[in-house]
């Protein structure tokens, strides 16, 4: 009788270990799952209220799967959205493989909504890419993005159109109250590299960048290439 109970216990332990192995993703960290915000419906009058990185990732996925007009706002009671579990450099000591952020808005579904950072901060944005249009947002058109600070962003791209906020901001965008802190770094490998946006067609109001920007051609502290519009009270930093 005791032997049967021992076998049952061993089988139970084995099953639990198998379940844990399945839940543990390749790379040594627990899987991060995007989750829909519990407040808002994505309209301009009732934007999705973002309270954590999981909800920002869900918003990204919703935009990139056809919801290109939805609007979002970071919650009043949140100070920081930390993306470290959704994008990070490789770390052998933690058995972590590199995970690059997939931008909001792409060549299939360019973002055209309003995103209000509500005076909050996004930290630990990490991008290391070999394709164009890289930033927190990839491609945006006629959108409004405002009231947002970035800290500890690390963005590298070997192609064109790269910025910490947006890679390509074309055709009538409004960027307002955007701050890139000196804890951020950005390095582009081709045309159009900027601290806030690689390419901008639109208006930029009260935008500041304290990070050093490196690139090869059409490099700017604020934007790499400014097509048209009005920059007002903007402070670029050194571009190399």
Regions found by a protein language model. Give the residues of each.
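Surface-exposed repetitive/solenoidal architectures
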Residues: 29-240
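Bacterial N-terminal signal peptides
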Residues: 14-26
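Bacterial N-terminal signal peptides that target proteins for export
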Residues: 2-16
């Amino acid at each position: 009788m005791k032997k049967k109970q021992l076998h049952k216990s061993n089988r139970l332990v084995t099953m639990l270990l198998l379940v844990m192995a399945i839940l543990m993703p390749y790379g040594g960290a627990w899987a991060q799952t995007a989750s829909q915000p519990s407040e808002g419906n994505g309209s301009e009058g009732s934007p999705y209220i973002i309270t954590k990185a999981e909800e920002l990732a869900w918003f990204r996925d919703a935009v990139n799967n056809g919801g290109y007009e939805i609007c979002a706002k970071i919650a009043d009671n949140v100070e920081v959205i930390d993306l470290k579990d959704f994008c990070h450099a490789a770390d052998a000591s933690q058995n972590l493989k590199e995970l690059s952020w997939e931008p909001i808005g792409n060549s299939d579904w360019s973002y055209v909504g309003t995103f209000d950072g509500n005076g909050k901060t996004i930290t630990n944005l990490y991008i290391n890419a070999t394709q164009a249009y890289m930033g927190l947002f990839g491609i945006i058109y006629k959108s409004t993005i405002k009231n947002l600070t970035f800290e500890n962003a690390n963005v590298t791209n070997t192609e064109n159109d790269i910025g910490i906020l947006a890679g390509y901001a074309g055709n009538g965008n409004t960027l307002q109250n955007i701050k890139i802190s000196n804890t951020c770094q950005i390095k582009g490998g081709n045309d159009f590299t900027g601290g806030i946006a690689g390419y901008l067609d639109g208006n930029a109001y009260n935008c500041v960048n304290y990070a050093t920007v490196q690139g090869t051609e059409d490099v700017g502290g604020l934007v790499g290439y400014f097509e048209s519009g009005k920059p007002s009270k903007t402070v670029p930093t050194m571009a190399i």
